[in-house]
From Swiss-Prot:
One of its GO terms (molecular function) is structural constituent of ribosome. This is Small ribosomal subunit protein bS18B. Binds as a heterodimer with protein bS6 to the central domain of the 16S rRNA, where it helps stabilize the platform of the 30S subunit. GO terms for biological process: translation. The keyword Iron-sulfur does not apply. The lineage of its organism: Bacteria, Pseudomonadati, Pseudomonadota, Betaproteobacteria, Burkholderiales. One of its GO terms (cellular component) is cytosolic small ribosomal subunit. Pfam families: Ribosomal_S18 (PF01084). The keyword Lyase does not apply. Part of the 30S ribosomal subunit. Forms a tight heterodimer with protein bS6. InterPro entries: Ribosomal_bS18 (IPR001648), Ribosomal_bS18_CS (IPR018275), Ribosomal_bS18_sf (IPR036870).
Length: 92
């Protein structure tokens, strides 16, 4: 069985997202001058947790790597102490 290569199909070039609507990301913790992210600051931690309870990656939030590691540790500590839920998928 032979495979026929179709050259009549035109491949569309890959388009990048328009930079017109893209907002520049910045690290909130660097701007605020935070030294250590506290696991008891639940309002801040909730901003970095998605709808399903997953930790939002740094490439989406713009957080620097140093603070992203602290953020991950703080969220995991808050979950362990039952200050934050592991997931929002629990049915009541």
């Amino acid at each position: 069985m032979a495979f026929i290569k179709r050259s009549d199909k035109k491949k569309k070039p890959f388009k990048k997202e328009s930079s017109l609507f893209k907002r520049k990301r910045y690290c909130r913790f660097t701007v605020a001058g935070v030294e250590q992210i506290d696991y008891k600051d639940l309002d801040t931690l909730k901003d970095f947790i998605g709808d399903n309870g997953k930790i939002t990656p740094a490439r989406l939030t713009g957080t620097k790597a140093h603070y992203q590691r602290q953020l991950n540790t703080a969220i995991k500590r808050a979950r362990f102490l039952a200050l934050l839920p592991y997931t929002d998928l629990h049915k009541h």
